[in-house]
Amino acid sequence: MKTPIQFLFDFGSPNAYLCHKVLGAIESRTGAHFDYVPILLGGLFKLSNNRSPVQAFADIPNKLAYDRLEMRRFVARHELAKFTLNPYFPVNTLKIMRLAVAAQDLGCAPAYIDVMYSAMWEQGRNMDDGEIGRASCRERVSLVV
């Protein structure tokens, strides 16, 4: 049995969403298995004395433009037509990431993760609003929140 690969994720990261959308194909093609590990990306940035690319490159327009270009290329290559930048970005994901841990304990993490990523990066919902998060869950996940 192959050692699983940890996929550290935060729903607030568009890059994590993009990775999530292609991991299934990688698993099918290679036989690898990814274990999803919820983290708070903002906390990781703080711990490592780092900043998000949006903040780090705010004063470097060409770098931000190239980052967006690469994102568009990735989206096109992998046919991720539903992806859209969230108008509420950046979003405080503390609550929905805590629920990701609970969803793992309850055995409904894959469905919860799909719903949260869809709400955040396909539907452009304000996932910082607890009621919107709860409504998103009620639509598709057997998780009482």
Task: Please describe what each predicted stretch is.
Residues 18-120:
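Structural alpha/beta surface segment adjacent to cysteine/selenocysteine redox centers
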Residues 1-22:
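Local sequence-structure signature of Cys/Sec-based thiol-disulfide redox active-site neighborhoods
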Residues 1, 144-145:
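Residue positions that mark polypeptide boundaries
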